[in-house]
C-alpha cells in the first residue's frame, strides 16, 4: 500500500541465540564473564581457560553470518528477485530486530535480572548492534525497529513479573537515546499475545503434567503404588482430559497454536499482527 516498488525482505533467523554472545557486534567488545560465573565454573571443576577460549570463538559468530548473508543477497539481487532492475538499484528501507528469550532467561550473564537495570548489558549490546549494522551496511540513518519481546502478554503480578518488566525495558531503552531519536523505534509485541490460546495451553499442560505424575508414580497421584498398566494410565488420562479441556477448546488450540509459548505459541494471528506493527513503524519513520 505504501510503495509502488517491490519490497525484498532479507531474513536471517537462527533459534536459541543470544545478543550477549551469538549476535554480539564488534563495537560491544569481548564478552566478559562476571565473578559469579567464574566462581561457579571453578566450583563445578570446569576448565575455565577452555570456556574462555570457546566463548571468544562463539562471540559475534551469528552477527558475522547475518552480515555476510545480507551482503551476499545485495550483491546479486537478481538471484532471488529476477525482475530486479539493476539500473535503478535498491534502497535499504529498514531493519527489524526481534529476539530476546535466550538473554532474558540467562541468569549467568544477568545475575541481577530481577533488579532495576539488571539487564543494562542488553541495552548496551543493542545500542552497539544498531551502530554496527548501520556502519557495516553503509546506512548511517537506517530506520531500525526493536521488537520488544512480548511472550506472556500483558505482565501480571507473578513471581516472574520483575524479570519480564526489566527485560522489556532494557530492550526498548536504546530508542530513547538522543542519537537514535526519530530513526529507532521500540515496538511492543505483548498486545498481540493470544490470551485465549495461552489459557488453553495452561490446561493442556495440566494434562501433560498428570501423564508425568502417573508415569513416575508420584506419591500424590493415582498411580502412587505403580499398579496401573500403560493402558490404564491412558484411559485415566483420556477421562481426565475431558474434565480439563473440552472438544471446542481442543479444536481451537489445534487450529491456532503450533509451538511453545516462547515462540508465541506458533500462532499465525499473533505473528501477522506483530509483522504489521513492525512494518507500520518503519513506514511512519520514513514519512
Residue ranges and their predicted role:
Residues 1-287:
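Cell-envelope and extracellular/periplasmic
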Amino acid at each position: 500500500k505504501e510503495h509502488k516498488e517491490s519490497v525484498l525482505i532479507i531474513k536471517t533467523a537462527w533459534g536459541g541465540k543470544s545478543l550477549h554472545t551469538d549476535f554480539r557486534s564488534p563495537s560491544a567488545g569481548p564478552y566478559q564473564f562476571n565473578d559469579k560465573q567464574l566462581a561457579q565454573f571453578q566450583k563445578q571443576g570446569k576448565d575455565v581457560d577452555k570456556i574462555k577460549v570457546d566463548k571468544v570463538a562463539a562471540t559475534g559468530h551469528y552477527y558475522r553470518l547475518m552480515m555476510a548473508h545480507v551482503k551476499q543477497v545485495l550483491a546479486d539481487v537478481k538471484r532471488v528477485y529476477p525482475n530486479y532492475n539493476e539500473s535503478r538499484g535498491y534502497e535499504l528501507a529498514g531493519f527489524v530486530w526481534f529476539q530476546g528469550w535466550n538473554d532474558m532467561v540467562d541468569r549467568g550473564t544477568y545475575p541481577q535480572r530481577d533488579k532495576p537495570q539488571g539487564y543494562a548489558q542488553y541495552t548496551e549490546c543493542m545500542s552497539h548492534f544498531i551502530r554496527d549494522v548501520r556502519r557495516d551496511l553503509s546506512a548511517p540513518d537506517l530506520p531500525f525497529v526493536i521488537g520488544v519481546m512480548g511472550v506472556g502478554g500483558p505482565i501480571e503480578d507473578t513471581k516472574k513479573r520483575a524479570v519480564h518488566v526489566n527485560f522489556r525495558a532494557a530492550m526498548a531503552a536504546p530508542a530513547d537515546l538522543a542519537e537514535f531519536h526519530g530513526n529507532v523505534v521500540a515496538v511492543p509485541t505483548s498486545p498481540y499475545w493470544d490470551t485465549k490460546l495461552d489459557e488453553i495451553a495452561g490446561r493442556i499442560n495440566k494434562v501433560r503434567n498428570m501423564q508425568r505424575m502417573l508415569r513416575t508414580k508420584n506419591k500424590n497421584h493415582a498411580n502412587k503404588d505403580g499398579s496401573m498398566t500403560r493402558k490404564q494410565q491412558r484411559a485415566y488420562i483420556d477421562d481426565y482430559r475431558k474434565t480439563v479441556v473440552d472438544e471446542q477448546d481442543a479444536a481451537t488450540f489445534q487450529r491456532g497454536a503450533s509451538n511453545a509459548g516462547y515462540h508465541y505459541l506458533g500462532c499465525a494471528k499473533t505473528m501477522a499482527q506483530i509483522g504489521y506493527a513492525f512494518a507500520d513503524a518503519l513506514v511512519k519513520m520514513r514519512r
